[in-house]
Each structure stands twice: as C-alpha cells, then as structure tokens.
Amino acid sequence: MSSFDKLHIKSKTVLAPPSAAATPYRFDTRANLRQEMEERKQRFEDKKEVRGHMAEVLKKLVSNVAFFDNTHIFTPHHDVPDDSSLRLIVLAPEQFYLRTESRLAFDGVLDHVRNHGAKSRYHSNRLIFLAPDHGVLTQLRDCIRIALAWNSIVEDVRTMRLVLDNLQTQQAKEELQATEDVLQRVAQECYKWLLCPVQNNPTVAKLTVDVFPLNTSGATLESEIEQVCINNELVITAWSPIHLREELKKRYWKDNKPAFGAKAFWDDMLRYIYLPRLKNRSVLEQAIVKGASSRDFFGTAYVYHDKKFDGFKLCDANVQLDDTLLLIEPDIAKAYEAAHSLVTPSAEPTPPGSSPSGSTPRTFHGSVAINASTAKIGMVQVAEEIIAVLAA
C-alpha cells in the first residue's frame, strides 16, 4: 500500500462522521477547534449580531447604576420618555467620542435633548449621556465576535450539530466563559466618556456639551458615574438654601413680583438646562424646608391677592412643596412681617380720644400708599421708619 493510501485511510478514520447519514465531524486537535472559532467569527456583522450582543453586555454593565431613575441602551429619542425622571442614555456605537472628532457624539446628545419624536422635548434637563471611545470600539467589536463564535460552537455541540470529544467540549465552554469575562472589562473601558449638555447663558439658545472621562481601571462603573456626577455638580443630591435664594434672586424675584411659586420653579429646573440639575424633587423640598426655618433666605405663603399674603410665614419650617407654595424675597418678607405685626387690632379697643387709666397705648393703626412699580423699595422704607419710631 502506498504512503498516500495509508494517509487517506487515517484521515478518514479521524474525521469520519459517526454515521453515514450524519453531517457533524469530529475535530482531532485543539488547533482545529481554534480555527473553527476564527472562521465562525467572520460570520457576524457589526450592525446586526455584534450590535445586538453589545447592547446585552452594556445592559448588564449599567444594570447596577441605581443613581439614575432609568437607563436606556441605544434608544432613539422618540422612545425616551419626556418626564421628570433622571435618565442615563447610553449612545449607540456609531455615536462614538474622539477628542479630535466629537461631532457624532455631540449630535447624539443634542438630538435627544431637543427632540422627543416629532415634538420638542420639554424636560430637557433630565438627561446624562454615556459615549464609547473610538479607540477601544474596534477591540470591543472583535471581542464580541469571539464570544459569539464560541457561543455558537457550544450551542452546536449541545444540539448535536457538532460532535466534539469531552476535552474539546470543556475547552469550548471555558473559552466562552473567559471571553465573556473579558468582554465586560473591555465594554467598561470603551464606554468611558460621560457627556452633559450645557447652556451657560439663558439668552443664548446654542447648547454645548461638557465631557468627563471615567476612571475604568479600579472602581465599578456605577460608583464612578455617581462620583463624577456629584463632584462636577452634573447632578445635585443636596442643595443649600443659599443657592436656592441666589437662583430666585437672579432670575425670578423682581420689584413688581417679590414672590415666585416653588412648584413653577421646580418645573423650570426640569426644563431649562441653564438651571441646576437636581437629582429629584426631594432635594428641592429639603432646601425649601431648611431655608424656611431661617429669616435669611425667604418667607413663604400660599396665596397673594389684594397686596396680602395668605398663610404668610417667616422663620417657620412647617411648609410643604405643592402647587400653591410661594417663596417670598427675604427683605419683602421682613417688611411685610413688621408692617402686619403692628396693625393687628387689640382685643378691647378703647374709645377715641381716651386711653385706659394708667396705661400707655400699645396699638397703632395707620395706612400708607405704595407705588406698585416700586413696591419692594417702598415696603422696606416703611418698615425702617416704623422700626426707627419704636426704637426712639
């Protein structure tokens, strides 16, 4: 028998199918198993299988990010709800970020912020974004293809479409597990850019995007995102009444409008990107309660009509954020308190021209006309004059 015939018989023995009707073949060496994986890896397309598996990996990666109310993976803007929830948007791989080419990522951010389907987005100030790094994206895609290839081999062995010996079957399973473990780390290294829409000047309609790198070497993704958001005040978890007062003073309190609705202010914070982004409504409620307990920040009331504040309070923390709560400019609140504490009628009014025997009058009545356009200045002046009389 020739050498060729012997080799032919040996190859048929090694690679022979278990039965004449069967199609699977046995692999004889590890090199053949590796080669099969490399061949299968080329079957998977970026826009189909690779993209789908990438979404699954990222879903696991951000599943523990409890800092946000919701997370969205590759979700178009019309499918992202337009409400008060704080949301993390994971941008699609084609919306990658590169220091020298940021346009694709920035366009993705601004598209979500501005639009909700065919309509304009109302709650624009509730979105933070996570973008992939262009340099690591190729590595992530290749790692996904390897994982898909090993998974297809393991699945074919399970369904008997591919026959391997026990050693090779175990090897395929171990390779799949090792690749999946590596895949999580590569995905975190790839999605390492936190993007935040910015509007520094409310009179300028143009929006910009600030970029913050995430440390992917040590901390978990959820803790790193939370730390970057808090440290850079992208999302505020505790707000001082000082900052609340300054925002109201800068944008809302006017000479002819010394009070502003707390609920309306919260609605504006959800909408306008130039205002601070609070984590939730409770943060504003806590700031209001702290501020209401002092005389330095604002007074509160529930209705303003006929130049009177119904339910007026100053230095009283017993308030609740609802549709009726008004926050009053502190100087106006002090002047209003002083004026109304002096015009309270006595329990037993004395006849005109007389006073109780041996006592000094303690109740005074009076009125003054104040120009509505300069009400703030006028009320402060009246209060100062009254205090000066009492102190004399």
Predicted regions and their residues:
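Extended alpha-helical scaffold and adjacent linker segments that couple domains
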Residues: 1-392
